[in-house]
Amino acid sequence: MSSESPREAGSRRPARPRERSAGGVVVRGEQVLVIVPRRRAADGERVLALPKGHIDPGETPLGAALREVREETGVEAELVGELGEVRYWYRRGGRAVPKSVVFYLLRYVAGDTADHDEEVEEVRWMALARACTELTYEGEREIASRALATLDP
């Protein structure tokens, strides 16, 4: 067994995530809820993303996903099923940090997107099929595609 870390071995995906988050693919009919965070991508471009955030101590991943959806978008949702996990590296303070985000398929229950968090510039509904190609991050596009396949087998 090698003692190399995933980074040293050339892997793009971490073996043991040091940072864990949870998020939701919130659907209403054939529409999905997406956000444009105030924080821009590294190249300065706007980001189109799924709502997600850190799992607080003592919180379950599902609890975190529902809370983050509520905080970032202003809507309440209910669980349909789990969609899987996305793993990636990002940079914080010049260091590469491995991260894991578990995503859930959620159904819209109530709420107003105008009540979104101040860290979010915009919340909007868009066609789920369109989100599969237009979300900024590849892992989130894959998760949206899984949601579409789950809803329309």
What are these regions (language model features)?
Residues 49, 98, 125:
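Short aromatic/basic micro-patch
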Residues 50-83:
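The catalytic Nudix box helix
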